[in-house]
Amino acid sequence: MNWTELSIIINHEAVELATNILENHGSNGVVIEDSYDLINQPEDKYGEIYALKKEDYPDKGVRLKAYFNELTYDDKLRQRIKDELLNLDELDQHNVQFSEQIIAETDWENEWKNYFHPFRASKKFTIVPSWETYAKEADEELCIELDPGMAFGTGDHPTTSMCLKAIETYVLPQHSVIDVGTGSGILSIASYLIGVKRIKALDIDEMAVSVAKENFRRNHCETLIEAVPGNLLKDETEKFDIVIANILAHIIDEMIDDAYNTLNEGGYFITSGIIKEKYEGIQSHMERVGFKIISEQHDNGWVCLVGQKVSE
């Protein structure tokens, strides 16, 4: 199987909406190459730690690289994406450029590694690729060593970052945690680094479970995290203090009632993967079953909600 890399050079004002369009149409990740990064210090408040190469960036504007399965990326999808992008009010149509190339599966398996470097994902957590070395910058820094494989997120998506921030705030060592749709296992590992002793990681995809187990081994917690295939919380009988779910909004909506029933009194439901257009519906459903919304984060068109199970 091959992949189509759709490359688009656009103005800065259109980046957020264009990225959402690409992701909503099934892109398996979007790489953002911003010409401003060559001018400004490559360091944000969490500290990026890698050198930038001029040849990787456009002369002006922003290059977005989106990756689509060649079998599903046809003329209709190509035109639909182009039409939606060209209809954006924020887009400077005089300076937009489109190009495509085919990337072989063997190349794709390693191509994404060129864009994955150690980075601070939140106040405490730093994500470190398994093939790179990294020295902690502070004693309180918690490092997650990750080899997500090409099918799973690297931790730099806004939804993951927001979940990590919520874990920092609400998860305590004495809590028990269930991570639904664990993927690479990053949120389970974060809970372990906080000091949690009882963690269960579920994913309907057995490949995800395998990847997660390998990442648990890399972080020396494979014996402390139970990683198993599972269909959301439908068959879960054990109670937990924390339910974490960073998955798509329609799946979150399907599991809200089960999340409430799985939680101990006073427990927290940390959930993201919600686009801003759908978060009010998710929030209303959570409140309807008995959750009190105690935290709401927004980042680049995505939302993370934390609901607490409270007494009537």
From Swiss-Prot:
Its EC number is 2.1.1.-. SUPFAM superfamilies: S-adenosyl-L-methionine-dependent methyltransferases. Keywords: Cytoplasm, Methyltransferase, S-adenosyl-L-methionine, Transferase. It catalyses: L-lysyl-[protein] + 3 S-adenosyl-L-methionine = N(6),N(6),N(6)-trimethyl-L-lysyl-[protein] + 3 S-adenosyl-L-homocysteine + 3 H(+). One of its GO terms (cellular component) is cytoplasm. It is found in: Cytoplasm. S-adenosyl-L-methionine binds at T160, G181, D203, N246. It holds the Pfam family PrmA. Its main location: cytoplasm. GO terms for biological process: methylation. One of its GO terms (molecular function) is protein-lysine N-methyltransferase activity. It is an enzyme of class 2 (transferase). InterPro entries: Ribosomal_L11_MeTrfase_PrmA, Ribosomal_PrmA_MeTrfase, SAM-dependent_MTases_sf. Methylates ribosomal protein L11. Belongs to the methyltransferase superfamily. PrmA family. This is Ribosomal protein L11 methyltransferase. It comes from Staphylococcus aureus (strain MRSA252). The lineage of its organism: Bacteria, Bacillati, Bacillota, Bacilli, Bacillales.
